């Protein structure tokens, strides 16, 4: 929990602290912080806890929004944007275990963590072999990258266009835009099963949150 929160929140915070003096000293600057759709909707589906990541992304969004006024007062030439991507096709599923645990030494820890999550979600994972779990992890990582509606290159283009237009709020992907509208239209229902069903019916986040019949 602490490591996820530290990377996703303090990584942004300390990055801003490290570069702020240089930004203020420049003639013009633009600070771009990456939050997530989980910065305004704190789940990835029913029965899947997502607390540490969502808390960090909410923090990034709130911090970035607060900086808008702060910088208008103290450094009006420095602009701020907060980026909220939806499902973007990256290799994060492959790279995260390598960075956090190492290529080989961390395989056992990855299997143990994955087995625990699957059992907690009600999947019969006790008798599944380590090799099968590692294969499943690789398949999921590939599916996350390859089934995304927005590529990493497209996401970069959307972000740069938003910065050029000096938009402080940049939603990345049609799925992010749809989710934002849905949450705003019915905030009290944002964590109900029907809310997720509405997203699936509209064709958004189907790879990340499959229907109950596909779990």
Language-model-detected regions and their locations in the chain:
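Substrate-binding pocket helix/loop in short-chain dehydrogenase/reductase
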Residues: 1-2
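Conserved active-site helix of classical SDR/Rossmann-fold NAD(P)-dependent CH-OH oxidoreductases
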Residues: 13, 58-65, 69, 157
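A short, exposed helix-loop element centered on a Lys and neighboring polar residues
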Residues: 16-17
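Residue(s) in the substrate-gating loop at a strand-loop-helix junction
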Residues: 36
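Active-site-adjacent segment of SDR/Rossmann-fold oxidoreductases
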Residues: 41, 45, 66-78
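Active-site YXXXK catalytic motif of short-chain dehydrogenase/reductase
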Residues: 53, 57
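SDR active-site lid
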Residues: 73-170, 174
């Amino acid at each position: 929990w602490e490591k996820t929160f530290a990377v996703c929140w303090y990584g942004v915070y300390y990055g801003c602290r490290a570069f702020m003096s240089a930004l203020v000293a420049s003639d013009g600057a633009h600070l771009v912080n990456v939050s997530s759709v989980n910065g305004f909707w704190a789940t990835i589906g029913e029965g899947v806890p997502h607390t540490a990541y969502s808390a960090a992304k909410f923090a990034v969004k709130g911090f970035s929004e607060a900086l808008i006024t702060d910088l208008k007062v103290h450094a009006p030439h420095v602009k701020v944007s907060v980026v909220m991507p939806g499902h973007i096709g990256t290799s994060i599923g492959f790279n995260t275990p390598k960075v956090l645990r190492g290529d080989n030494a961390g395989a056992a820890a990855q299997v143990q963590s994955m087995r625990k999550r699957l059992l907690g979600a009600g999947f019969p994972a006790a008798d599944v072999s380590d090799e099968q779990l590692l294969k499943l992890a690789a398949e999921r990582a590939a599916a996350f990258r390859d089934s995304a509606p927005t590529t990493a290159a497209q996401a970069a283009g959307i972000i740069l266009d938003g910065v050029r237009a000096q938009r402080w709020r940049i939603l990345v992907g049609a799925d992010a835009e749809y989710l934002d509208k849905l949450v705003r239209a019915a905030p009290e229902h944002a964590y109900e099963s029907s809310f997720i069903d509405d997203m699936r019916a509209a064709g958004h986040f189907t790879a990340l949150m499959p229907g109950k019949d596909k779990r």
